[in-house]
């Protein structure tokens, strides 16, 4: 059994850190890093001039691994275990919030966390190490429910075929490891051409999102940031796949009154106050230098908004284009 606190292979490189710091410059005051992970963004913000950073993570391992270096920042660094959708309970009047979505490199590199289809490990995928694991979902969901998860959360076109194969295989023997599940999925799909992603990529993404409630957490986090930021405060979000980016894009469009009129024949609606101004008009991706240094950045996109003094308002899952399982629609 691998030591659960062993350091991941290779240094952690925060994605899009340089363009993020450029977009939010000058960095001053108190910031919250809602996805602390290995501390890459937190270190970058502190080095850029933040007076204090509150590092939030649901994974207790993140703080165990930060112990060797966190103390050097003194009271400039505050660590808070929890979910970023509750950030407004941890702090108010923030000057900035950073969210780096999805699984962290630290979690991906530790085989025993069960996030990677490239390494043998228990089929876990829990970021907080609490609640049902991916193995539990694979064992307990019906074929229809599994297909719904794979299609809705992973945009997997072969979701029904894969779900059928999983149900067939689990009847023979429980599916409890990452490589066993990856092998089952590979058997359902054509061999990928050079440059194409691994056949299990979308299915593993879907299960991870379901296990951790990532879309609900993202929606809650965007709303919590709106409540926690002071006027002029900045919200920077880094996403890694199209669904996350679409949700963040829709949030900023909605809050900046940039959604447009869905029906050109309908009477114009009275413009509502804007909760955010767009800092990045379009999503910012990695440049060629970052791609060469960190291949994991290839799908990363950054969006940044600036908080106004307008009162926070609610938003629906539909308005955010948030995928929902059939049973919750």
Swiss-Prot record:
Q: Where in the cell is it found?
A: Cytoplasm
Keyword Thylakoid among UniProt keywords:
no
Question: What Gene Ontology molecular function terms does this protein carry?
Answer: rRNA (cytosine-N4-)-methyltransferase activity
In short, the EC number is 2.1.1.199
Q: Which GO terms describe its biological process?
A: rRNA base methylation
Output the InterPro entries linked to this UniProt entry. Answer: RsmH, SAM-dep_MeTrfase_MraW_recog, SAM-dependent_MTases_sf
Swiss-Prot/TrEMBL keywords: Cytoplasm, Methyltransferase, rRNA processing, S-adenosyl-L-methionine, Transferase
Give the top-rank taxon of the lineage listed in the UniProt record for this protein.
Bacteria
Region entry Disordered, spans: 285-305
- Cite the binding residues for S-adenosyl-L-methionine: 39-41, 57, 84, 100, 107
**Where mainly found?**
cytoplasm
Q: Which reaction does it catalyse?
A: cytidine(1402) in 16S rRNA + S-adenosyl-L-methionine = N(4)-methylcytidine(1402) in 16S rRNA + S-adenosyl-L-homocysteine + H(+)
Its GO CC terms are:
cytoplasm
CDD domains according to UniProt: AdoMet_MTases
Please give the family membership noted in the entry. Belongs to the methyltransferase superfamily. RsmH family.
Give the function comment from the record.
Specifically methylates the N4 position of cytidine in position 1402 (C1402) of 16S rRNA.
Q: What is this protein called?
A: Ribosomal RNA small subunit methyltransferase H
Phylogenetic lineage:
Bacteria, Pseudomonadati, Pseudomonadota, Alphaproteobacteria, Rhodobacterales
